[in-house]
Amino acid sequence: MAPRKRPENQKTPEVVVRPKSKRNRSPRELEPEAKKLCVKGPGSSRRFDSGLWAGLASLRVPPLCSSIVRALHQHKLGTAAWPSLQQGLQQSFLNSLASYRIFQKAAPFDRRATSLAWHPTHPSTLAVGSKGGDILLWNFGIKDKPTFIKGIGAGGSITGMKFNPLNTNQFFTSSMEGTTRLQDFKGNTLRVFASSDTCNVWFCSLDVSVKSRVVVTGDNVGHVILLNMDGRELWNLRMHKKKVTHVALNPCCDWLLATASVDQTVKIWDLRQVRGKSSFLHSLPHRHPVNAAHFSPDGAQLLTTDQKSEIRVYSACQWDCPPSLIPHPHRHFQHLTPIKASWHPRYNLIVVGRYPDPNFKSCSPHELRTIDVFDGSSGKIMYQLYDPESSGIMSLNEFNPMGDTLASVMGYHILVWSPEDAGTQK
């Protein structure tokens, strides 16, 4: 399908650097601001429930852990096992979240942001796609103007993005325009890997394996296509009854593929043995349509996000065992970018945006639209990030490969979180 050009009326990307505050404000000091941002629920008054701040404050200050230096010394002496050392490092990171602030914002799009990808080797560079097909390449570590690639407008939504692991000056995209393609930073199309040639079929997801040199992409009618890096199609099969919302290759066993769908299933496949739609290794039924399925960085777990109120964590060596269930409000809404939970790249932590639901079992009267951090082992909520000046729903939240900077998508806006001192230096 030939790309359509869009009128030259796109606004200039807006990037805002947040100045360092003189001191950290307590939740009590923020309470008057939060009152203005709360949505009045059925039968509720405009009075803000101060008990919510008390609960949030208790989450915002994790208990102190033992000295990391001591833990490293004990590990060196052989008196501390690696898991305990890893747990100590994770707790230290959780403690640092109290200092995280939004230090940069960008609002470059005229339609909401729909996808997000971090550069694999430049920890201050990310790519963000929009519903209009626009793409922003932003290195927030320098003062240069971000690179803006204009899309086609309506019908051009970027549904998936990934930097090319073989050449990080290029990136893959899947889109509602009906293509999965490889582009450079100037917006030139280097190769079209898949094209529907019809407006009724579009691509919703993609992933890339550098080891196997393959690209996998899924469409809105249930097909999954596997191609090599030269663009040659290896197979094209209908693996689901409905839209394939997410495809993910295991980072350690790159022949292991997970596909998620609005048909309320996640399926696990061995790429070496795919013969047809029934050749999956495991089918993991869900109660609701599924937005995403992410393997953990070590490949040992699978994280799924449905379109209602459930996050699941499966063990990759025990697919038949019941998963860990994490109740969490993130319901689907037509004009909201689907909420997807993601892994922290270094610790067994899950990060996901909250969409308060009055019908959710544990919903508070004036619940905030926070970014929630869960322990991947216990399912316990460990921390909640919140900025009253950016109180919208954070649909996408991903840490950079270093694990020290968080990018969030909130409607039209891109937000970058970092420890306050580090953010000021950046």
From Swiss-Prot:
Cellular component GO terms held in the UniProt record: cell junction; Cul4B-RING E3 ubiquitin ligase complex; nucleoplasm; nucleus; site of DNA damage
Processing after translation: Phosphorylation by ABL1 negatively regulate UV-DDB activity. Ubiquitinated by CUL4A in response to UV irradiation. Ubiquitination appears to both impair DNA-binding and promotes ubiquitin-dependent proteolysis. Degradation of DDB2 at sites of DNA damage may be a prerequisite for their recognition by XPC and subsequent repair. CUL4A-mediated degradation appears to be promoted by ABL1.
Motif (DWD box) on chain: 255-273
Keyword set, alphabetical order: Acetylation, Chromosome, DNA damage, DNA repair, DNA-binding, Nucleus, Phosphoprotein, Repeat, Ubl conjugation, Ubl conjugation pathway, WD repeat
UniProt main location, coarse: nucleus
Keyword match Cell inner membrane: no
Gene3D superfamilies assigned: 4.10.640.30, YVTN repeat-like/Quinoprotein amine dehydrogenase
Region (Disordered): 1-33
Annotated WD repeat ranges: 115-150, 158-193, 202-237, 243-286, 289-328, 342-385, 395-419
Residues with PTM Phosphoserine: 26
PANTHER family recorded: DAMAGE-SPECIFIC DNA BINDING PROTEIN 2, DNA DAMAGE-BINDING PROTEIN 2
Family: Belongs to the WD repeat DDB2/WDR76 family.
Job of this protein: Protein, which is both involved in DNA repair and protein ubiquitination, as part of the UV-DDB complex and DCX (DDB1-CUL4-X-box) complexes, respectively. Core component of the UV-DDB complex (UV-damaged DNA-binding protein complex), a complex that recognizes UV-induced DNA damage and recruit proteins of the nucleotide excision repair pathway (the NER pathway) to initiate DNA repair. The UV-DDB complex preferentially binds to cyclobutane pyrimidine dimers (CPD), 6-4 photoproducts (6-4 PP), apurinic sites and short mismatches.
Protein name: DNA damage-binding protein 2
Gene source species: Bos taurus
The organism's taxonomic lineage, starting at the top: Eukaryota, Metazoa, Chordata, Craniata, Vertebrata
